[in-house]
């Protein structure tokens, strides 16, 4: 198997994990020529003058965002591959990844609500019509939940973000004018008649996970809401998300006493070049009632420029920003470290934090050598 996480590479170059003993800091180093490939070492901190000609001066009077964490997505594929490992090897890998004393101290992970495009099959937790038929499915029960429990045993305070790739198909219509049923995993829109049921679906999912001992820190209403083409997907423009959050999801979480955060959007900096969707979360914030239920917005970097993060923060500094997906693969020559290491370091590891993101989460923590 190939143990793969972009963030593992990104934090390796002169970056520190949460692991710290006495005055030593654990550092993982990767160089773009692979002379050092994820080499772990201990660096002693002291008050001696550094040999480096560069000096970093900290001004304690200037404050930026506090960090909630760094991590990766724990998808169905990730969990399936982890469960295929020998238990002792899996434990060693998870400790190396999530322990803040024996490893890197990953502190934030993302999981799908129902299937993602890296699941074993397409499904939701309510494929039989009627929200009373909600139930966790085999992927959660056999793979995702057992792995999450192992992670929580290593890192009890880890934060978990949930995102759906699609609503149940019986809630879909082909468009909001004709409202014709749309029985496809790909594309479609959420029928407004099912806003309340879908909000209940979120509540039931959060409660079901918590019943398994898995606390959910936050959710997004829809992964990549402007992407109609994913294997499991749902189009949800900003006006739809505004109405869904304001009239259903936000109130439903509040009335059930759940403190789960809601982050809007969860898609690209350039809003997939759709003119009418530009400034997506900011348009939702302009509605005071909808904004009251939103902690902030989430972004991916598959299109556009990270300067959009500064734009959003400048206009709505009271709303948080988190970064929830980036990936490498054949399509972007992602394994070519000589070409990509510093570019990815600048774009994802530094470009997000330096532009107000409180969390940085990359895509699949682990895949096999067939990229699945």
Spans of features found by a protein language model:
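Structural recognition of the beta-strand scaffold that forms the well-ordered cores
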Residues: 68-76, 107-112, 117, 159-163, ...
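Aromatic/acidic polysaccharide-binding cleft in carbohydrate-active enzymes
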Residues: 320-372
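N-terminal catalytic cores of secreted or lumenal carbohydrate-active enzymes
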Residues: 36-216, 237, 247
């Amino acid at each position: 198997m190939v143990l793969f996480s972009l963030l593992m590479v990104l934090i390796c170059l002169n970056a520190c994990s949460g692991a710290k003993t006495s005055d030593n800091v654990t550092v993982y180093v990767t160089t773009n020529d692979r002379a050092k490939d994820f080499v772990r070492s201990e660096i002693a901190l002291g008050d001696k003058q550094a040999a480096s000609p560069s000096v970093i001066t900290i001004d304690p009077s200037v404050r930026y965002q506090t960090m909630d964490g760094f991590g990766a997505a724990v998808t169905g594929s990730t969990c399936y591959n982890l469960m295929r490992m020998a238990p002792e090897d899996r434990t060693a890998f998870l400790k190396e990844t999530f322990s803040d004393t024996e490893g890197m101290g990953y502190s934030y992970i993302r999981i799908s609500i129902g299937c993602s495009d890296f699941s074993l099959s397409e499904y939701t937790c309510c494929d039989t019509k009627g929200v009373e038929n909600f139930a966790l499915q085999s992927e959660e029960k056999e793979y995702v939940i057992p792995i999450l429990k192992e992670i929580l045993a290593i890192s009890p305070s880890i934060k978990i973000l949930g995102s759906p790739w699609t609503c149940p198909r019986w809630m879909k219509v082909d468009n909001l004018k004709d409202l014709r049923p749309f029985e496809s995993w790909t594309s479609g829109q959420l029928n407004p008649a099912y806003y309340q049921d879908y909000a209940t679906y979120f509540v039931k999912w959060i409660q079901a996970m918590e019943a398994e001992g898995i606390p959910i820190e936050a959710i997004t209403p829809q992964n990549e809401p402007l992407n109609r083409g994913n294997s499991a997907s749902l189009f949800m423009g900003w006006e739809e998300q505004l109405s869904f959050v304001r009239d259903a999801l936000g109130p439903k979480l509040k009335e059930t006493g759940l403190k789960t955060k809601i982050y809007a959007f969860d898609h690209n900096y350039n809003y997939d070049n759709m003119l009418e969707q530009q400034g997506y979360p900011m348009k939702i914030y302009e509605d005071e009632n909808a904004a009251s239920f939103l902690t902030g917005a989430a972004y991916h970097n598959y299109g556009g420029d990270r300067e959009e993060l500064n734009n959003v923060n400048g206009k709505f500094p009271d709303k948080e920003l988190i970064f929830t997906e980036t990936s490498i693969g054949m399509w972007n020559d992602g394994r070519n470290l000589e070409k990509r290491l510093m570019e990815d370091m600048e774009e994802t590891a530094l470009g997000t934090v330096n532009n107000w993101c409180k969390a940085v989460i990359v895509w699949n923590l682990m895949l096999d050598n067939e990229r699945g």
